[in-house]
Amino acid sequence: MSAPAAARRAGARHAAAAPLAAYVLHHYDWSESSLVLELFTRERGRLAAVAKGAKRPYSQLRGVLLPFQRLQVTLGRAADDAQAEVHLLRGAEWAGGAAMPGGAALLPGFYLNELLLRLLAREDPHPALFDAYAHALTLLAAADEAGWQPVLRAFELRLLRETGVLPELARVTLTQQPLRAGSAYTLQPEAGVCASSSGPGISSSVQSVRA
């Protein structure tokens, strides 16, 4: 093996061993004693990892691998399976921080997790989105039911921007003309921002979305 190739492989092993900031988005059974985790990490995006032995009664991971709990995880791969999409969970510990959503606030929290699972590709880092997700969980934990909707809508917009789905909101999508103060516009799922004949309330809504 050439020296550069050996250096690259050594660097890859070092990167794999570095702790990652992570949240558990979802898990499902892998075997009688193990789980497959869907993780959202700050450094490497969405990943899948096998947590061997996590279902055993005395496993230290049972109280750690919980949704909405910020973790520090260490991942690896088997030596003969370097290209596998599913990683091995080498270790996980609670990272501390803000309170987790509980009770009725679990429902909007799981909604955020579902958005990330459906819209994020694997191994595609979005550190700013990770931070926005952590902030949204903090807000949900502190808010009552009336306060959930602003948190969810703000996160949806951030997610659409990060994934490149949200159109430019300062212009009419079809004509690329700038939005004019006092005019009314609507945001259509397939057409983007469109001029509207409705009242001025829609215009102010678009302005708030742009903000």
PLM-predicted stretches and their roles:
Residues 1-35, 40-211:
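Non-catalytic alpha-helical scaffolds and adjoining flexible linkers that form interface surfaces
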